[in-house]
């Protein structure tokens, strides 16, 4: 049997497009989460939405690993563009992910004792995503993502752009990557841009 894939979204609207793809779907509840399990083509999968923010995403990721026995997690949803070259409706796929609101030594001097603040995307999942992006004909970018507990705007956006040079920002990806790293589980985040740095700048002008 092929490895079981976990699909984790922040909101029910982000999860909704995946549910019709699940054949022989079953539904159960755990930790106040609704878990959908079935098969996408011949691949076993479990899908859920966590609710917004880092802790909710981390809880959901651990449930997927412990209860659903997934062997990889894909975090899917929306994000805000940070790099000025990013446009609304572009898709961004994470090559690496970090928190923009956590002190660096929290991750390097304490558990999980990382070499840097960046959680890398899984190479095999990235190779599959690269091929899918080429086949899609849609605007897809690969690069850094950052995660924090609040929406960014104005000076906050500029500070994050200068410090981390990400393509986009969200409120869950790094937390899911963190849990996957601690459990030795492959991870990838795929985000569609719903707001861009250029649009935010225009609104402030």
Label each residue range with its predicted role.
Residues 82-164:
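Mid-sequence, gly/pro-rich, charge-dense loop/helix-turn segments that line enzyme active sites
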Residues 1-62, 68:
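N-terminal short beta-loop-beta anion/metal-coordinating cradle
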Residues 187, 193-205:
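Regulatory input/activation interfaces that engage signals or partners
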Residues 45-51, 142-146, 190:
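Active-site-proximal beta-strand elements of phosphoester/diester hydrolases
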């Amino acid at each position: 049997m092929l490895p079981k894939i976990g699909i984790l979204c922040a909101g029910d609207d982000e999860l909704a497009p995946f549910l019709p793809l699940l054949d022989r779907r079953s539904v159960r509840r755990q930790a106040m989460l609704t878990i959908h399990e079935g098969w996408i083509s011949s691949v076993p999968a479990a899908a859920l939405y966590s609710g917004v923010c880092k802790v909710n995403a981390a809880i959901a990721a651990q449930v997927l690993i412990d209860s659903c026995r997934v062997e990889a997690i894909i975090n899917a949803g929306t994000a805000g563009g940070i790099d000025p070259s990013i446009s609304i409706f572009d898709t961004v796929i994470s090559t690496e992910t970090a928190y923009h609101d956590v002190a660096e030594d929290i991750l390097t001097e304490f558990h999980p004792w990382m070499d840097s603040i960046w959680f890398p995307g899984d190479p095999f999942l990235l190779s599959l995503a690269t091929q899918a992006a080429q086949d899609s004909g849609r605007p897809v970018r690969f690069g850094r993502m950052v995660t924090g507990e609040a929406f960014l705007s104005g000076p906050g956006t500029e500070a994050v752009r200068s410090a981390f040079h990400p393509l986009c920002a969200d409120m869950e990806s790094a937390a899911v990557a963190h849990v996957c790293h601690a459990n030795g589980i492959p991870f990838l985040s795929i985000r569609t841009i719903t707001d861009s740095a250029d649009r935010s700048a225009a609104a402030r002008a």
